Amino acid sequence: MSDTNKEVVDLVWGRPSGGGVPASLFRRWSQGFVFSETERSALEQFEGGPCAVIAPVQAFLLKNILFNTEGLNWKDISEEEQRTVLCSTLSEILELACLNKSQAFHLVTWPHAKTTDNSDITDSHPEPESSQPTDTPTALATEELGFERFHSVIQKRTLRTVAELKEAVLSLYDTWKNKFGVLLFLYSVILTKGIENIKNEIEDTTEPLIDPVYGHGSQSLINLLVTGHAVSNVWDGDRECSGMKLHGIYQQASVGFLTLMESLRYCKVGAFLKSPKFPIWILGSETHLSVFFTKEMALVAPESASEQARRVFQTFDPEDNGFIPDTLLEDVMKALDLVSEPDYVNLMKSKLDPEGLGIILLGQFLLEFFPDQDSVIPDSFPVYHYNGLKQSNHNEKVSYVEGTALVMGFEDPMVRTDDTPVKRCLQTKWPYIELLWTTERSPSLN
């Protein structure tokens, strides 16, 4: 194993004691990008773990199919369209990870990888027919190639321009869909980003990107694929905590991220992930990632003045109390380019805090400076949910669950729907959302 490969292994898998990475964990991550036979634009996930890579790729894939490709029937794409859209999506994520477009891109692949069917590891390491049952998907790795052997044979390929990158990624389509495609792509993103750059962004460099016990991807890994930055947090910008600077998300993401952990008050997702450029959100449970999406672009309309005010106010309220000390009112008003003359600020303090409690409530602040604005969101619109695990789908066939969403500014008991993990996750963005699914059972977050 080369020094570079060892650095990648340490970053991704850590340095597990007692015999290295468990074979069962490596096997779960050893699959390629494979499209469902039932839903031709949906990727399948064979076992728990690699959703940290597959779900972000699926989210970008949907963005490109729904919004960047004219004349494409997103429910029925051809094999050639699958090839084109998957490879353009992988290239896009690699570009996102590259800090400077003048730097090189790196692809991790097999030595002398071919670009035709039956290529890659099968050529140089033939396996007995019995080791690969015919009914096993081609992207699920065999037991023949263990952890050490895999990392001793993979090689790095360097591309200097975006055009070269796109051409190379397209030519390696069979590599991405067969055997270890997910890991090869993940390693490509890591080397393109730069190992030291990732270490500088991760909060705790002793924590590997893949949990050595359960096999789940870390938040840093998810953020790296979604935003190009391997930061460990989901809030907007940087925060100070006990003299330490903790890094968050720096700009609006193309696809979003919402988590059930926020409904449990373990964290709070910032506006840059909660309000992405396209109406596609990765949903996180305690153990799995799925994708919620719609074609309704009104959901991601430019940030309104009141939404901006809410976001800025909350940066001064990091614990999400719903209020700030009145001493910070002037700073908030300055940040929003409101009149901030001392006399006016004092007048607003007395108006917003008539009882002299020394706090300014978020609701009162928004009501005073940004009275109710008409929502551009339609009363109802079609929505879809994707879960790549077969066992989490009806009849164990990976397909989108369709439904209708109602987003209201108040709770209406007349249209109250079941309380499900998917709904609780979405309520972190739309507190009064209701979901009516076309299936008998609601889609699974796990």
UniProtKB/Swiss-Prot annotation:
User: Where mainly found?
Assistant: nucleus
Q: What is this protein called?
A: Ubiquitin carboxyl-terminal hydrolase MINDY-3
Which subcellular locations apply to this protein?
Answer: Nucleus
Catalytic activity as recorded in UniProt: Thiol-dependent hydrolysis of ester, thioester, amide, peptide and isopeptide bonds formed by the C-terminal Gly of ubiquitin (a 76-residue protein attached to proteins as an intracellular targeting signal)
EC identifiers of the protein: 3.4.19.12
Q: Provide ranges: composition bias, Basic and acidic residues.
A: 117-128
Q: Which GO terms describe its cellular component?
A: nucleus
User: Pfam family example for this protein?
Assistant: MINDY-3_4_CD
Q: Which GO terms describe its molecular function?
A: cysteine-type deubiquitinase activity; K48-linked deubiquitinase activity
Task: List the gene name.
Answer: mindy3
Which residues lie within the region annotated Disordered?
117-137
Q: Which sites are catalytic?
A: C51, H288
* Domain of life where this protein originates: Eukaryota
What is this protein for, i.e. what is its function? Hydrolase that can remove 'Lys-48'-linked conjugated ubiquitin from proteins.
Q: Tell me, which GO biological process terms does this entry list?
A: apoptotic process; protein K48-linked deubiquitination; proteolysis
Q: Does the keyword DNA-binding apply?
A: no
The entry sums up its family as follows:
Belongs to the MINDY deubiquitinase family. FAM188 subfamily.
> What's in the keyword line of the UniProt record?
Apoptosis, Hydrolase, Nucleus, Protease, Thiol protease, Ubl conjugation pathway
